[in-house]
């Protein structure tokens, strides 16, 4: 029964769906983490990349005093009570005049758990492109430009990589379409699909307190975890059950994203694909030994799940997380 429950949970995460977070298997030392609040201790930013069939990019001209007249992708901070998609649609409407639908999450960027930006590939579904006659405090205007000939000045050059990422995804999608799942969460946390592979066999680390489950680690907002980024919470959990000095841990990227934003629930859960391997060369048929009784390795026997995991691992078929 436990194996069936784990298989269902893993299948859900691999499909980009996820599940509710009820507790965490690892948390920063000291006080238990308090619920996060937008505008108080966390900031989420949404950004949209639009690519037309003519290979044009939608840009907006900034109205803010510090960058007035420069060009950027439609972007802005989420407001309390919004879902991620609602925030994206509001920002695009305010800055570009268009209605839109997100196609997929393209990238997640973080400066520690308290500042996270969600980058989407999106498509317009209506509205009227904002012109200079409608200039306001949100933007001066919006316009389409050839991807290879963007206007100057740009507000920042970080968007160039994002535009190319969108173009690459359109040409050859590296991961399935992934959209935020509307599931509430109080904390910034990560659910780990931590894998060890040997030949064509895959093991997944599971939490064993209560019903066996994919482990969840809470991100701390203290200065050390802020400086180290969100990988710190992943390494903390693994350090609690594995001897890391003879292992190589790689965070491959995201399988999914969970957030709701209503009823004062401002947390997010990132479902993260992680690999664990031995540092020394040689064939290791068994995963590294687990310390303590709170975690164990689960050998994935279901052929479909095993092949999905191997495909996602070998093709790096995940949403990238960047610092």
From Swiss-Prot:
pH note: Optimum pH is 8.5.
Domain Nudix hydrolase positions: 37-167
Species this chain originates from: Homo sapiens
Enzyme Commission number(s) of this protein: 3.6.1.58
Motif segment (Nudix box): 76-97
Cofactor list: Mn(2+); Mg(2+)
Protein name: 8-oxo-dGDP phosphatase NUDT18
GO biological process, one term: nucleobase-containing small molecule metabolic process
InterPro entries: Nudix_hydrolase, NUDIX_hydrolase-like_dom_sf, NUDIX_hydrolase_CS, NUDIX_hydrolase_dom, NUDT18_NUDIX
